Amino acid sequence: MKLSIIIIATSLVIAVVAFPSKDSKAIENDKTEQRMEIVVQETARACSKQIGDKCKRNCECCRKTVVCGTIYVGGKEVNQCMDKTSDNAILNGLGKGMNFIENTFSFCV
């Protein structure tokens, strides 16, 4: 009796693992579409905005460590060019390094 319960339980576990649900496929397709949209949105443009100006993309912001970041003013989302990431000097330096890497892979002209 115990052997049959173990065999049935093992079979159910194998079935669950072997046959993924349709929902996981849908989520994977959504991720692929999102990646494709990001690539299309990040088109090459010359920089035209300075720190504090409103922006839509990283390529619009001038300087190597400046990115188009999001802040919230009065509960509204505002995108603007910024390079400061923290009041802590060490964390700010690391943040600027990350901004530099992000801009390197933006392929801006």
From Swiss-Prot:
Taxonomic lineage of the native organism: Eukaryota, Metazoa, Ecdysozoa, Arthropoda, Chelicerata
Keyword Ribonucleoprotein listed: no
Protein family according to the UniProt entry: Belongs to the neurotoxin 25 family. F7 subfamily.
Keyword Heme included in the entry's annotation: no
Compartments in which it is found: Secreted
Prosegment residue ranges: 19-46
Protein name: Hainantoxin-XVIII-3
Biological source species: Cyriopagopus hainanus (Chinese bird spider)
The record's note on its domains: The presence of a 'disulfide through disulfide knot' structurally defines this protein as a knottin.
Cysteine pairings via disulfide bonds: 47-62, 55-68, 59-108, 61-81
UniProtKB keywords: Disulfide bond, Ion channel impairing toxin, Knottin, Secreted, Signal, Toxin
Residues annotated as signal peptide: 1-18
Function: Putative ion channel inhibitor.
A GO molecular-function descriptor: ion channel regulator activity
Tissues where the protein occurs: Expressed by the venom gland.
GO cellular component, one term: extracellular region
